[in-house]
Regions:
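N-terminal, positively charged, Ser/Thr/Ala/Gly-biased leader segments
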Residues: 1-24, 145, 157-159, 163-183
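A glycine-rich beta-to-alpha transition motif near the start of alpha/beta enzyme domains, typified by
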Residues: 1-139, 190-306
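Glycine-centered secondary-structure boundary/capping sites
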Residues: 89, 156-158, 172, 262-263
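Short, solvent-exposed secondary-structure boundary/capping segments
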Residues: 138-147
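Short, charged/polar, Gly/Pro-enriched secondary-structure boundary elements
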Residues: 151-155
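Selected transmembrane alpha-helices and immediately adjacent juxtamembrane segments
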Residues: 179-180, 188-191
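Active-site donor-nucleotide binding/catalytic segment of nucleotide-sugar enzymes
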Residues: 183-185, 290
Length: 306
């Protein structure tokens, strides 16, 4: 079997995208994710994303991590899937004006030229509304997303901490103790603020926290350093994928954690290894809004095993 695909990334958080509107195929998707993700022996990616017909919206996105596990949500992946779906006509008939919350966020983002269009996309975390900034040539240059309300109840993240909310909670590492805040943005995140970000041994500490017994579904891990009230630097270890260049839901979780800990204001720029994301935690509607790029790298055909 051959499978046509696109390689896309959001700030270096890259995935192989397969369009199941254009190709009516069935495959072992977890195994394909494991095959395409290695950078020496596959296409090279953080995982696999399927763009397919939705049950509750025109388009649905499914995400498989590099290890084959299925994820509920990926912010960078959603932006890329939204761009692909718009530019390939998959959102025709459902495009509309920006709803109130996204319109307010877009006004703050103040992008020059172009026009905004919105559409719903189905994910494992529910239906999310995307805002597409369309420029000359009907091309999407930036994508905003209404990421919804953060989940803060410990049991729903899920964690086994006894506290109702995990905010700046002590957490023991093999060589010391840190303060951790846990947030779900449709997937679970642990955020640790530190003034010594350059000293973090992410390859050692990341998997230790990811697989800790406190997190029954494992967890995404982020170390962050506040550079001011409106800017934060972030390093990410993703559940099922390891170190990545960026994590959209993780950046949203960092913005929320920074607000809960009193370190950050509502509007924040997150500095990630792959670039910058603009975030807004709007306390009026309790939604988190995200803006960032979605980049097409190349298209190809997979000839390997499935």
């Amino acid at each position: 079997m051959t499978i046509d695909f696109y390689k896309m990334h959001g700030l270096g958080n890259d995935y192989v995208y397969v369009d199941l509107f254009a190709q009516k195929i069935e495959a072992d998707w977890p195994e394909l994710a494991r095959q395409v993700s290695p950078r020496q022996f596959g296409v090279g990616s953080d995982g696999l994303i399927l763009i397919c017909p939705g049950q509750r919206s025109a388009v649905r996105m499914r995400i498989f991590n590099a290890d084959g596990s299925e994820a509920q949500m990926c912010g960078n992946g959603l932006r890329c899937a939204a761009r692909y779906a718009y530019e390939h006509g998959l959102l025709d008939g459902v495009l509309g004006e920006l709803p109130e919350g996204l319109a307010a966020a877009a006004a703050g983002w103040a992008l020059a030229g172009g026009k905004w269009r919105s559409a719903p996309i189905e994910t494992g975390a529910g239906i999310l509304t995307v805002a597409l900034h369309v420029v000359e040539g009907n091309r999407v240059d930036q994508v905003g997303v209404d990421m919804g309300r953060p989940i803060l109840e410990a049991a729903r993240i899920p964690t086994t901490f006894s506290a109702e909310m995990v905010v700046a909670h002590p957490f023991d590492l093999p060589d010391g103790q840190v303060r951790m805040t846990c947030v779900s943005m449709g997937n679970p995140h642990a955020v640790i603020f530190t003034d010594r970000l350059d000293d973090v041994d992410l390859e050692r500490i990341g998997p230790y926290i990811e697989n800790h017994e406190r997190f029954p579904e494992r967890i995404n891990v982020h170390f962050a350093k506040a550079l001011g009230r409106d800017r934060v630097k972030v390093l990410t270890w993703e559940r099922g994928s390891g170190r990545t260049m960026a994590c959209g839901t993780g950046a949203c979780a960092v913005a929320v954690a920074g607000g809960l800990e009193g370190r950050l204001d509502g509007a924040v720029v997150a500095e990630l290894p792959g670039g910058e994301l603009r975030l807004l935690w709007n306390r009026r509607d309790d939604h988190v809004y995200m803006l960032g790029p979605a980049t097409i790298v190349f298209e190809g055909t997979w000839l390997g095993p499935v």
